[in-house]
From Swiss-Prot:
Substrate binds at T13, A14, S15, G16, K17, T18. It holds the Pfam family IPPT. HAMAP family: IPP_trans. The keyword Ligase does not apply. SUPFAM superfamilies: P-loop containing nucleoside triphosphate hydrolases. The gene is miaA. This is tRNA dimethylallyltransferase. Catalyzes the transfer of a dimethylallyl group onto the adenine at position 37 in tRNAs that read codons beginning with uridine, leading to the formation of N6-(dimethylallyl)adenosine (i(6)A).
Length: 313
């Protein structure tokens, strides 16, 4: 029996994924699933470039606005939620179209999840107590002894990832690198994978800067002010660590000026795009590349590839 079909539409931030997905929704029997670790949060619309109400009316997206900003979400959660959504879409006779730039989520779907333990509140509390006394740099040094490869990939100030890496070791006796090498069950779908980006990096950088300034015009600072005023959120939460939000939060905390926040937000977004492109260039599966500056041709290429490889549309 043939596996059902799924489509991945990947790419760096500001590359035009949402516009292309909406155009495809009008021509193909697809339903969109968001693959974005920021779009899952409610009350975070402008700074995440979340599709507007008008856009969602044309192409409803699953897995957006599902969590409060104080909650955490992981690749494990996404894996379960996405598989459920994909099965539901397939059962309705349509094709799952997964759209976004959180590459770790795509990897989790394609390769399955490594057998990592669930969070343990007691161990996390002990790790945090140690950090409060000696600092996260001390724990990062400890991680260097336990798991040099993981430590080299984790910033010494990244408390969330340091905590998780140490927690995994204390729970299992094995380091994160060892455990993540143990592959899980692969995705039970035939997947056609596309990536969209401008051919010139300078064009992407310009789009990122223009979009950030547009978000400011739309009221991004006011959006973050409302989150800041809630009183139950803090800068170590995954939601507030999202690019743009972290910098606006620093401004509201009096740490940097608004101009600095905007500049740093643009720089952080460009760094995010660079990491996303690095993921894509090292991707193990075959990808069909699309040009952000030629959306009509990109749409035609996707439809042509689908007809040739999987289905008659």
């Amino acid at each position: 029996m043939n596996k059902p079909v799924a489509i991945f539409l990947m790419g760096p931030t500001a590359s035009g994924k949402t516009d292309l997905a909406i155009a495809l929704r009008k021509q193909l029997p697809v339903e969109v699933i968001s693959v974005d670790s920021a779009l899952i949060y409610k009350e975070m619309d402008i700074g995440t470039a979340k599709p507007t109400a008008a856009e969602l009316a044309q192409a409803p997206h699953r897995l957006i606005d599902i969590l409060d900003p104080k909650e955490s979400y992981s690749a494990m959660h996404f894996h379960a939620d996405a598989l459920h959504a994909m099965a539901d879409i397939t059962a309705s006779g349509r094709i799952p179209l997964l759209v976004g730039g959180t590459m770790l989520y795509y990897k989790a779907l394609l390769e399955g999840l490594s057998p990592l333990p669930s969070a343990n509140e007691h161990i996390r509390t002990e790790i945090e107590a140690h950090a409060n006394q000696y600092g996260w740099a001390s724990l990062h040094q400890q991680l260097t002894q336990i798991d040099p490869l993981a430590a080299s990939r984790i910033n010494a100030n990244d408390s969330q990832r340091i905590n998780r890496a140490l927690e995994v070791f204390y729970l299992t006796g094995k380091n994160l690198t060892e455990l993540t090498a143990q592959q899980g069950e692969c995705l039970p779908y035939q997947v056609l994978q596309f990536a969209i980006a401008p051919q010139e990096r300078a064009v992407l950088h310009q789009r990122i800067e223009q979009r950030f300034h547009k978000m400011m015009e739309l009221g991004f600072l006011t959006e973050v002010e409302k989150l800041y005023a809630r009183g139950d959120l803090h800068p170590d939460l995954p939601a507030i660590r999202c690019v743009g939000y972290r910098q606006m939060w620093q401004h509201l905390a009096g740490e940097i000026s608004l101009d600095e926040a905007i500049y740093k937000g643009i720089c952080a977004t460009r760094q995010l795009a660079k990491r996303q492109l690095t993921w894509l260039r090292g991707w193990r599966s075959e990808i069909t590349w699309l040009d952000s500056l030629d959306p009509t041709s990109s749409q035609e290429k996707m439809i042509q590839n689908l007809e040739q490889n999987f289905i008659k549309l």
